[in-house]
Amino acid sequence: METTHRVVIGDSRDLALTEDSVDLVVTSPPYPMIEMWDDAFGSMNPAASEALADGDGDRAFEAMHAVLDDVWAELQRVLCPGGIACVNVGDATRTVDGRFRVYPNHARVLSAFESLGFDPLPDILWRKPANSAAKFMGSGMVPPSAYVTLEHEYVLVFRNGERRAFEPGATGRYEAAYFWEERNRWFSDVWTDVRGETQSLEGSEARDRSAAFPFAVPYRLINMYSVYGDTVLDPFWGTGTTSLAAMVAGRNSVGVERDPAVVETFEARAERVPDLSRSVVEGRLADHRAFVRETRDRGGSLDYEAEHYDFPVRTKQERGIRLYEAASVERADAGYRVTHRPVEEGRGS
């Protein structure tokens, strides 16, 4: 199996993609009203900078989201019928004109997608501990003017119309099944076992303009909402974590990024994909074998046999599961080509 991974330097408000050409969107946009993104939003919509200069936080918030609205409209155009869009976004806290408040980015993004006709699906909260050891803001130990510290982000999930249709027995779908115990963990509405990613980019400008999320977030979402051979789009590509996860998960990807300096940092990450892929796949197999042992130790039973591995599984739909590892990564036109091979029996044991 081969997958391709393109990176486009451009503006996500005008995607150079045909209609219905991607199967899944996984992205983490710049968050409105987070100070590090003020200049970026101001360059795309001067009304945002003007509102901040006037001390009008509400107007700045809306002007920044107007930029994102144009991107969401493009996603509606390029996402296939029934395709899923996953948007990782956090709320912002900020003092503007002497008044501290929260700016609810997740609610504004939800409203924008609904206005485009997307169906909202249950969302996910994942814990992202703040860098500061202090768990409060404001007046310290004296009530009532301290503020809760935001330590979570949202993964908003939307479907583009009716459920996606598949041919009965589609191989790519059933090989892409996840384990029962993975489903229980991944489809929980609160993720406490992922952590925010520390940036390590070369050059202060590239580092300042990055908003990466941890690998586990896009990797899970890609496995949850796509099948082998699908194409995943990230319109705010940044450090390329979504493409990295797609490479490991056996999906194609397209990334769009405005800053060439950020894109240049990805090659070193791509070179490590075979090792990362091997580690992830072996970890999943080892975790399932541990689940089998624990289930049997408790006197439980697993009633189905996996077709490609020598272990049992809990449900009939898991029987065809087949994990692939990235055997090689090569540079290709405007991106990378990855060759995948199925992981044979005996790995991860």
Write out the residue ranges for each language-model feature:
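S-adenosyl-L-methionine-dependent nucleic acid methyltransferase catalytic domains
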Residues: 1-137, 146, 181-349
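Core SAM-dependent methyltransferase catalytic element
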Residues: 80, 116, 145-164
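Proline-centered turn/helix-capping motifs that create local helix->coil transitions or kinks
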Residues: 163-168, 183-186
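Active-site-adjacent helix-turn-beta-strand microarchitecture at beta-sheet edges
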Residues: 169-180
